[in-house]
Amino acid sequence: MSTPIALVPARTAEVTRNTAETRITVKVNLDGSGQSHLSTGIGFFDHMLDQIARHGLIDLDIQATGDLHIDGHHTVEDVGITLGQAVHQAVGDKKGIRRYGHAYVPLDEALSRVVIDFSGRPGLVMDVPFKSGMIGTFDAQLAHEFFQGFVNHAFVTLHIDNLKGENAHHQAETVFKAFARALRAALEFDPRALGQIPSTKGTL
């Protein structure tokens, strides 16, 4: 007999990562309402993380301090790693989830598509030709580092494509919003397959 959704354990996690370069704590509730408490020291990055919370309906608390006197690379990458670990821990055995999710999100002239698979196999394919190298104090190249860190530790396959865009802020925002929407879709429970692992292998 399938397990009612109400009896599924809370999908929450808290992960701390401390290195010589960064100190990061991430708390997630995959069945939240989109609340966020974010402090990474990089304003635009906080703005993008807020998109993940709001559009993914994930409660997200991220507190990070890093060697920003050098640049944002270690902070952004390590937040991706820690968030990936937290999501992997919170999602558990993946029973009953839809597994796959995709979303298209526009913002004015920009349009991005994100497709995700909770496959258990880390893989990132990202094609985002940013029109500017910097977005505020955020190095646009670090978007790739964030998603690579997430993918490697959430054990997901992720395809990200910016299909149109002339403004780098708009490009990034559509990418993060589409990621959030795809994540939300993949993590939703399928009422017709509760208690089942969504794979013919019987494991993910």
From Swiss-Prot:
EC number: 4.2.1.19
Membrane-spanning intervals of the chain: none
Name by which UniProt lists this protein: Imidazoleglycerol-phosphate dehydratase
Pathway, per record: Amino-acid biosynthesis; L-histidine biosynthesis; L-histidine from 5-phospho-alpha-D-ribose 1-diphosphate: step 6/9
GO molecular function: imidazoleglycerol-phosphate dehydratase activity
PANTHER family per UniProt: IMIDAZOLEGLYCEROL-PHOSPHATE DEHYDRATASE, IMIDAZOLEGLYCEROL-PHOSPHATE DEHYDRATASE HIS7
Source organism: Albidiferax ferrireducens (strain ATCC BAA-621 / DSM 15236 / T118) (Rhodoferax ferrireducens)
One Gene Ontology cellular component annotation held by this UniProt entry: cytoplasm
Gene3D superfamilies, per the entry: Imidazole glycerol phosphate dehydratase, domain 1 (3.30.230.40)
Catalytic activities: D-erythro-1-(imidazol-4-yl)glycerol 3-phosphate = 3-(imidazol-4-yl)-2-oxopropyl phosphate + H2O
GO terms, biological process: L-histidine biosynthetic process
Entry's localization field: Cytoplasm
PROSITE patterns from the UniProt entry: IGP_DEHYDRATASE_1, IGP_DEHYDRATASE_2
UniProt entry keywords in alphabetical sequence: Amino-acid biosynthesis, Cytoplasm, Histidine biosynthesis, Lyase
Family: Belongs to the imidazoleglycerol-phosphate dehydratase family.
